[in-house]
Amino acid sequence: MSLSSLEHKLTYHVRNWLHGSGFAWNTLHMSAFLVALCACIPAGFISQISLYSEPWREHLGYSVVEVNVLFSAVNLGGYITPPLLGLLSDAHGPVMLSWLSFVGFVPTYAYAAWVFASGEPHFYASVLCFTLIGISTNALYFSALFTASKLYPASKLCSISLPATFYGMASVLGSQLLKIPWFRNGLPYLDLSRVFRTLAVAYTLISFCMWFATSIVTMLKVKAATLTFAGMQSPTEPLLPQDIRRRLRNFFHDPAAYFMALVLLLSLGPMEMFLTNMGSLSSLLGQASVLPEFAIASTCSRFLSGLIIDLCIHNGVSTMSVQWAVLLLGVVGQWIVVLATRASDGPLLSLASALSGACYGGLFTVSPILTLAVWGDAVFGTAYGSFMITPAVGSILFGLTYAHIFDANCTPSGVLPVCIQHVFWSSTSALAIALLFSVLMYLVFWRRKV
C-alpha cells in the first residue's frame, strides 16, 4: 500500500535520517516497539483524574456535578473519536495520531495549569480542554497500539496484551509519582498547576519519541510496498482498498457487532463511573484512596488475560470464557460496594476496588482480541474504535446518575454511606445483564469462531 502524501511529509526527514544512521533494521524494529510500549504509560495518565476531584472542588469551587461533567468530557472525547482515529491511522499511518496527540495534549494542559494557578473556575473552557485531552489520550494510545500491532502482527501478546498492560501501569506509576511532596506545594491537596505543567512537558518528549517510532512503521510499509511491486507479496500485507471496504460493510451489518457494543456499554460504563468517583466514595466511607488496589488489579488483569487467551487458543478453549470471567468479577465487585455502603466498611471497598479493577483491565484486553479474531486485522482500528463509542454513553449515564444522587442525598454532614447504594445496585445489574448478553452472543453468533 503506497503512502499518503501527509504520511510521507510527516515522516520524510526522520526516515532519511534513519536510513543514513547505519542502525541495523532489527535494532530499529525493537526500538520502535519499546518506544510504543513506553508511550502507552503516559497515554494512561488520565486515569489519575479521580485524584483531581478534591483540588477542583476545594481550590476552584466546582460542585460534584461539575467535576463529573469534566470526567464525562474526558470520556466523551476519548470514546467518541476512536472510529475516526482508526480511519486516520489506516489512511495516514500511526504518525498522524502521534502528532494529533501532541497538538491536543500540550496546549490544553498548559492552559489547565494556568486556570488552576489563577484560581478562577473558567469551567466551560476547562470542559473543552478535557474533551481535547480525552481525544488526545486515545490518539496517543491508538498510535502506540497500532505501531505495536504493525511491528508484531502475529503475536497477540506483543500487539495487544503488552500495550494494554503498559497502559494500565499508568495508574500504578501515576498514583505513586503524585505522592511526591513537590506536587502538593504545601497545600492539603494536589497543586494541579504543577501537575499539569509537568504533563505538558512529558507529552512533548513522548510525542518526539513517537515521531521516530511511527516513522519506522512507515519504513516497514514502504518495504512491504516494494516487495509487492516486485511480485513477492507478503501474507501479512494490508488488504486492497476494495477488500477493506467489503469487510467494513460486513462489520457494520453484523448483528453480533451490536451485541458486543451493548456488552461494552453495560460493563465499561459502570466501571468508568466507579473509577472516576472512587475519591468521593472513599471519603464517604472514611477510607483512604482505593485507587492503588484498582490500578494494580487492572494492570495484572491486562497481562494475565492475554496469557490466558493464548493458552485457551492453544488448548482449543473458547476465548469468550475469559470475557465471562472478568464480567463475573465486575458483578461481584460492584455488589460488594453495595455491602460496603450498607456496613460502612472501608476494607470491603478495597476488595471491591480490586475486583472491579480486574474486570476493567481484563475487558480492555479481551475486547480488542475478540474484535481482531472475529473481524480481522484489516478493519481492526475502525471496528474496535467503533466499539469504544458505547462506553462513552455508559460512563456519562452512570457518572451523572452518581453525581445527582450524591448531591441530592450525600452532601449533608453526618450522612451515612448507604445514601449512595442505589447507584451500585444499578451498576451491579448492568454488569449482570452484560454477562447475559455475552453468553447469548457466543451461543447465537460465535460458537465456532472464538
Swiss-Prot record:
Keywords: Membrane, Transmembrane, Transmembrane helix, Transport, Vacuole. This is Probable transporter MCH1. The chain crosses the membrane at residues 32-52, 69-89, 96-116, 127-147, 157-177, 199-219, 255-275, 290-309, 320-340, 355-375, 378-398, 423-443. It is found in: Vacuole membrane. Belongs to the major facilitator superfamily. It is a multi-pass membrane protein. GO terms for cellular component: fungal-type vacuole membrane. Probable transporter. CDD domains: MFS_Mch1p_like (cd17354). The lineage of its organism: Eukaryota, Fungi, Dikarya, Ascomycota, Saccharomycotina. It comes from Eremothecium gossypii (strain ATCC 10895 / CBS 109.51 / FGSC 9923 / NRRL Y-1056). Its main location: membrane. InterPro entries: MFS_trans_sf.
